């Protein structure tokens, strides 16, 4: 294998698309907090100082979507009218209806739920980082989280909510990360901050603490390459739910079936099966059965079991792949109801997933990030 490079990006919680993801998942959580069986499919669009929320919700919860949206926007940091978008003055329109009875016909099938839609879903894990995530997306998220911490903590008081990061990692001929070739940080900032202060602050509070050990003299470091990023967030760009799929998942290091996560309850396999696929793949790698693992699942609307369960290990497996695939099928529940129960997805936990990635965040209490099936998996494999 020849050496190659991989580039992944991340965005902060104030990015317009992420604002939408968090509003959609905030509304989902508000429903689940009162009604764990709520059916929710909510999309959000933000543009300028306007928010449009649309979708289908069937629930017994007493929902105030407008209030929830304003709370999310304020928590992100858009509370000042000077930003051009703020929680107090933004205009919010809603168009929320109940779930189509034709869809419900396929989902509500007695004790065992059917899939809310068809889809192909992928989960991935590798041994490049402690969280078993690819190194590029791990670094990119780390930089974005440092930006957010520096803003919320007042370390860099001139930071504003919007921001993006990107890293390029070079891999050696054996597929191991060997060098960081490029780091890009673009962050919204107050009008009055001078460039020298901005660059020094980002280097000292964001870049060095996160990837300092990877920096070499030849590493290319770019901070606000255009020179100015004052207008940002929804005041600068329109945002829509579900437009940061690679940021949400593996930074382009694994396949993606195309279905977004945010705003969808757990009967939607776009979300639930992607989480279960990650859970399975992560346990395979944690068990030492492969260095890299991708689990693929496919579902038909109304059916409770998958049409396909496939395991790809890219030649890094330590046991026969057919044997490993059989063990994955036996160890993990892939029915819709089984996945919901195993991952405890009736809880209001989803807003936490809506920024900085759905995977690799082991301190958030997500069941799909646990490696608690390693022993069971190895036992089924006869190890």
From Swiss-Prot:
One of its GO terms (biological process) is one-carbon metabolic process. Its cofactor is Mg(2+); K(+). Its main location: cytoplasm. It catalyses: L-methionine + ATP + H2O = S-adenosyl-L-methionine + phosphate + diphosphate. CDD domains: S-AdoMet_synt. GO terms for cellular component: cytoplasm. One of its GO terms (molecular function) is ATP binding. It is found in: Cytoplasm. Its EC number is 2.5.1.6. ATP binds at residues 15, 162-164, 228-229, 237, 243-244, 260, 264. Signal peptide: none annotated. Keywords: ATP-binding, Cytoplasm, Magnesium, Metal-binding, Nucleotide-binding, One-carbon metabolism, Potassium, Transferase. Belongs to the AdoMet synthase family. Catalyzes the formation of S-adenosylmethionine (AdoMet) from methionine and ATP. The overall synthetic reaction is composed of two sequential steps, AdoMet formation and the subsequent tripolyphosphate hydrolysis which occurs prior to release of AdoMet from the enzyme. This is S-adenosylmethionine synthase 1. It comes from Rhodospirillum rubrum (strain ATCC 11170 / ATH 1.1.1 / DSM 467 / LMG 4362 / NCIMB 8255 / S1).
